Swiss-Prot record:
Known EC number: 6.1.1.7
Source organism, top-level taxon: Bacteria
PROSITE patterns xref list: AA_TRNA_LIGASE_II_ALA
Positions bound to Zn(2+): H566, H570, C668, H672
Chemical reaction(s) catalysed: tRNA(Ala) + L-alanine + ATP = L-alanyl-tRNA(Ala) + AMP + diphosphate
SMART domains: tRNA_SAD
Stored Pfam families: DHHA1 (PF02272), tRNA-synt_2c (PF01411), tRNA_SAD (PF07973)
GO biological process terms, semicolon-separated: alanyl-tRNA aminoacylation
Keywords assigned by UniProt, alphabetized: Aminoacyl-tRNA synthetase, ATP-binding, Cytoplasm, Ligase, Metal-binding, Nucleotide-binding, Protein biosynthesis, RNA-binding, tRNA-binding, Zinc
GO molecular function: alanine-tRNA ligase activity; aminoacyl-tRNA deacylase activity; ATP binding; catalytic activity, acting on a protein; transferase activity; tRNA binding; zinc ion binding
Protein's name according to its UniProt entry: Alanine--tRNA ligase
Keyword ATP-binding: yes
NCBIfam families recorded: alaS
Native species: Clostridium botulinum (strain Eklund 17B / Type B)
Amino acid sequence: MKFTKTNDLRDAYLNFFESKDHLKLESFSLVPQNDKSLLLINAGMAPLKPYFTGLQEPPKKRITTCQKCVRTGDIDNVGITSRHGTFFEMLGNFSFGDYFKKEIIPWAWEFLTGVLELPKEKLYVTIYLDDDEAYEYWTTLTDVDKSHIFRLGKEDNFWEHGAGPCGPCTEIHFSRTDEVPKNSEEFVELSDADKIIEVWNLVFTQFDGDGKGNYEKLASTNIDTGMGLERLAVVMQNKNSIFEIDTLENILKEVGNLASVKYGEDNKIDVSLRIITDHIRSITFMISDDIMPSNEGRGYVLRRLLRRAARHGKTLGIKDAFLCNLCDVVIRDCSSAYPDLEVKKEYIKKVIKIEEDKFRETLDSGMEILNNLISELKENNEKVLKGADGFKLYDTFGFPMELTKEILEDEGLSLDEDGFHEEMKEQRERARSARKTSNYMGTDVKTLDIISSEIETTFDGYENDSLIAEVKTLVNGEDFADSITEGDNAVVVTDVTPFYAEMGGQIGDTGTIYNDNFKGKILDTKKNIGGKIIHFVEAISGELKVGDKVTLEVDNARRENIKKNHTATHLLDSALVKVLGSHVHQAGSYVSADRLRFDFSHFEGVKEEELLKVEQLVNEAIMSVTPVNTTEMDLQEAKNSGAVGIFDDKYAEKVRVVCAGEYSKELCGGTHIDNTGKIGLFKIISENGIAAGTRRIEAVTGMEAYKLVNEKAELLKQISGKLKCSEKEITSKLDQQSKEMKEKEKEITILKSKFASMEINDIINSAKDVKGINIVAYALKDVDGEALRGLCEKVRDNVNNSLTLLTSSVDGKVVICAMADKEAVSKGAHCGKVIKEVATILGGGGGGRPDMAQAGGKLPEKISEALDSVYKIVETLVK
């Protein structure tokens, strides 16, 4: 066979179809664009849906690709079997209203038997039951053995994957056995036994399915083929599974080296090796496409894969973070086809390292708690872990539900998934209730949402801050009204307005509304569900009626400040991408008159030097006095021009593009200044994390930034005065004082420990016998956790057959420590169980091993009650 290596097979396929006048396209991102039906790209044709359905014009009627894909539907089987994987590459050639069955069938045969030189006697073909046309072309345009062609039903030879283009198909299979099927039943049996494996699927796309069994004919017939690169490599390299082909074997061997194990010697070890090998491929490619670990959507898929792989690394005995280095093998073997991997190598490694470290910090604690829960289940002869316990592991220790399930299944146990989801639902309801509002400024929200669809409201405020308009609707409280008078708080809807309604993170305009008979304040401007611009008005004097003509006047000074802040967010977005990398994407914003807030994707806290650089770049753009131009253009034209936008959102065909020279170009419907110089000054107030993988920057501009600088200067002046030093000497003076304080704190700690040690005899002498075990339960004051552990050790070492539980009240909180020697444990003493109940009495929580446990509490006033309970708890434990 001419080609065997995976990378060579990819090139051979793409080159073959280029020779057939196909346009070779790079793989699309794993993140679907403008397709809400998919979480991740899971098929070669998925990114090409708009071409198949006619929504977009393809760059050429013939296209070929090798598309990276991720499927997680079978994730629970990945590793358990050697067949399943989450990441794969799909070779494909596509025709959009050009060639059809007559061309693709002989081409497919030519590639497999001519280019790849596969033996014809090993190839089998299946076609859809009544597809006589396909049968004719196979028998007249190729030299396939007719006895190797089988007709199968819809389940096997009608391709559809959710909603979208679909149709009958023909599949080409490779036989790995000497057995020869005589009919379709025997063929299916051999196929189910993996003795004959599918290599290539040629889909004759004729329909657009809605995923519910309904089909419409497409405007023109299309071709969509898919051949899994890894599966093809299995055939060409004569391997038994995808984990043995060159690219995956390289990863698997590296994991084996790290864990000092070999593949094929132990089934349990093999499962872990396969899981890590597969998952690191998905992880690497997902991060390269700017997917960040999070608790929802595709970010959750990434987090689940990463944490599952990390857990199996620990199972194999790998102690340190390793996935961040294992991705080097993926990048090395795949970067020739996907150069972005090499470009983003350090970024990929960093994201993995941070997430891996974060999980490893909680993995041990979480596993300890889960192991205790498993022990309790087995002791009580129970098989199902409560949903509330599973949810706590997820909420506190970051254990995805699926990971908890997997660990439980290894022990022959299961999770109450319904209970888990109920806990999740309750948490979301609590969050939703905290946000929910039933009215706005005294006006019923439901009433606002049923304003007549016949009323048209037009925004004409980009160039105007004052307009004459006609009042179309009034809403006063819960009801529509014909008029409003002095003292009313109402909603006014007009036919036209210069007031910008809150949208895209920018707050609504305020100002005045008046005519000869009425004067009112516009306190806010929003849009209702129907898209009507609604003004929230406080009636100051006179009467306003439906049909009246009024003057609407925006508070221009306030709007100017909003415009400064909005343009500044664009400059900030651009600066963040330049400093932190192309993975940065807007995740939200808030633009008001006095400040701005910008949320963005990033995997760690922004370093101080990075923040300074970002701030510098924004101020450089401001000081460049660059004109800010706004242009209306087609959406596709805007994309092609390099304009930044959240393209998962829905845009109209015509969009506004706001451009600040070389500094920024974004799709935006908000209001902006006409020159960057008008911003004046930009200062960052804070940077912090608001969710996993999401950071937030708050900043001020113009006079607010000037005030901030002055306030900081005044603060420095006051601090230097208090410290009796110059402003330049403040840090050194504080360092000196901090050092002196630490020395004094150390002296105090030593003294406290000495005082506590003086009580050691009293503590030992307090021991009481409970069922043959010496129980010490004693309360101390102002002893920290470390000193308390030391005292516990002393008591344990001096009192045989003992369980010791000590408490200490420190700054209104309680520290608890318990230790038991081997003899006490052998009799049934269990520090973890004792301390768990004691901590509950003290308003806290904790746990641990039979011989040692720690906890904390918030109710020092209940220490006496808690200590009294120790004897009773031990009495129930000791048989």
